[in-house]
Amino acid sequence: MTERPEQIQSRLAGLDQIGQVTSALNAIASGQSAAARGALPAISAHAATVADALAVAAALAGAGPGGGEGPGLLLIVGAAQGFSGAYPARLAEAARAALTPGTAVLAVGGRTLAALADKGVAVLWSAEQAPLPEAVPDLASRITDAILDLVGTHPGPIRALTGAADPGGAPEIATIFPPEVAPARGALPDLTLPPAELLQGLLSEALFAAVARTLMQGLAAEAQARMQAMANARNNLRERRAKMQAAWQQARQEQMTTEMIELASARPDAAAQD
């Protein structure tokens, strides 16, 4: 049964409303992506400063960052919200493939946490992703504290997995601890702290910087995934609207034809009555 033009017009209005929602979500995601990417250089600069200080502290202490033997920890920074397409599932699959027996998992992002559960990945510690770049330092501090609490019972390297820095790229995994310590440059300074104590504090700060960078990159990657999902949704809406517009025109033409036939068939009766 062909729908009436009024019914199709109502459905067209509904599609237009959905289009407005997707446009708003895309605008928000675009702003988040730009803000997160804009914050990355500052985090990298902080990490570089810590690395320079770490080189000096290691030289004075006569020791490196160390790190126990074992499977270690895996930090997964994923998606907090929906409307991000297959991004949470891709991260969960990459995490499952990267796991080794005994690895403890820390996960950030509710959507990715659910995807990890679907893949059968057990999570030891979890948190929601920062909603804005401004909230990343506080979350990075919490995660750093959680990692430091767990390294005693889960020795080994600490790796981080999140979305690619480049849009559309595969998830990226990297070892964030222990850091690589470069040789110290220039004369070594005098210290007021014991070198070993300074080294330990700088190692914690290096871990914090690496976690913050991973969180910020994950925030940008999630926003980029949402932008791609909204672009796909807009393309789908355009196709559906074009088909529905054609259906409306056909229904309207059929309605007009029916009205003309009814008018034409009514004239002889009117003439006979005269």
Report each predicted region and the residues it spans.
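N-terminal assembly/interaction segments in proteins that build large macromolecular machines
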Residues: 1-274
